[in-house]
Amino acid sequence: MSKVFKKTSSNGKLSIYLGKRDFVDHVDTVEPIDGVVLVDPEYLKCRKLFVMLTCAFRYGRDDLEVIGLTFRKDLYVQTLQVVPAESSSPQGPLTVLQERLLHKLGDNAYPFTLQMVTNLPCSVTLQPGPEDAGKPCGIDFEVKSFCAENPEETVSKRDYVRLVVRKVQFAPPEAGPGPSAQTIRRFLLSAQPLQLQAWMDREVHYHGEPISVNVSINNCTNKVIKKIKISVDQITDVVLYSLDKYTKTVFIQEFTETVAANSSFSQSFAVTPILAASCQKRGLALDGKLKHEDTNLASSTIIRPGMDKELLGILVSYKVRVNLMVSCGGILGDLTASDVGVELPLVLIHPKPSHEAASSEDIVIEEFTRKGEEESQKAVEAEGDEGS
């Protein structure tokens, strides 16, 4: 059974059908956006039917645009004339889903295929604060369809249909070795140093899974290690319009294991950074959020060698920090404790899903309709022809 996403314009004359809303960036290639647009022939008449793909970077509030300030920059716009079809842009082979939709929807349905370029950023949303209004900042993609004499013509909101999609990356097929780091700290009045080593078994980890952090301590000093603290930081670089950098802690936990003077310690700790623990943090980077759908922490940005980082708009990375609180003793006790730490790079991303071909010719349509200012959705099973 094939699932299809449908969105209809406010005037009811145009509908877009897409087989999915997440399109995978394989670093060197990007999945094409293939779908079908259904149009009322009386509404189309002698005009042209267009489908447009836009990648935009939004970095300000909607309400400020009313006073002439624009906080949106279109990074990429691709316009395809669907009706009448242009000979310079011939339609390639239809996908199985397009063939099924054309058979179901009738003669007023037209296929389209949009191809993203490889140097575009992935979908990222910066989480707004409780007082923020309007659309959140970030990178978003949308597919839009409208009827006009030319693509530059101004079209009213009720006369076009648009559907937000996401560009996502999955874990690379070949991951590198697990990162490791170590440090040596010497203390006054201690002949031998304190050695801390931390490592992870693999470089790439998936959203929601426990991350195993291995810690080895060789404490040859006369100091006592009172506790071990492990944290995960998300680093977001906004490189398109400024050099802003935001660091948000998405996981932190203190472990009460103590390491006595002149002793050794080795243990593996499980840490799991998830959005639920940081859901109120303003500016936290999330995977581009589609309305009505849960999201998660933004995936690490994977960059093709030689790629211009500035074109990506927002770069996301993670690091694991392991810190030891070393008691210096004396009458002040823990007030004079020293901090010894190391950092490990972390790649946090989604696993590559397994694609299973749909064996049934049935199509389930998930339709998005507008209710007031909110959008709601309903799943509708299409049994028979629709929209002609």
Swiss-Prot record:
Record's function text: May play a role in an as yet undefined retina-specific signal transduction. Could bind to photoactivated-phosphorylated red/green opsins.
This protein's UniProt keywords: Cell projection, Disease variant, Disulfide bond, Sensory transduction, Vision
Record's disease association: Myopia 26, X-linked, female-limited: A form of myopia, a refractive error of the eye, in which parallel rays from a distant object come to focus in front of the retina, vision being better for near objects than for far. MYP26 is characterized by typical tigroid fundus changes commonly seen in early onset high myopia, and an unusual pattern of X-linked female-limited inheritance.
Family named by the database record: Belongs to the arrestin family.
Organs and tissues of expression: Inner and outer segments, and the inner plexiform regions of the retina.
Segments crossing the lipid bilayer: none
Record text on subunit structure and interactions: Homodimer; disulfide-linked in response to retinal illumination. Interacts with CXCR4; the interaction is dependent on the C-terminal phosphorylation of CXCR4 and modulates the calcium ion mobilization activity of CXCR4. Interacts with GPR84.
Gene Ontology molecular function terms on file: G protein-coupled receptor binding; opsin binding; phosphoprotein binding
Result after altering residue 80 to P: In MYP26; uncertain significance
Organism: Homo sapiens
GO cellular component assignments: cytoplasm; photoreceptor inner segment; photoreceptor outer segment; synapse
Gene3D superfamilies: 2.60.40.640, 2.60.40.840
Domain of life: Eukaryota
GO biological process, one term: G protein-coupled receptor internalization
Stated name of the protein: Arrestin-C
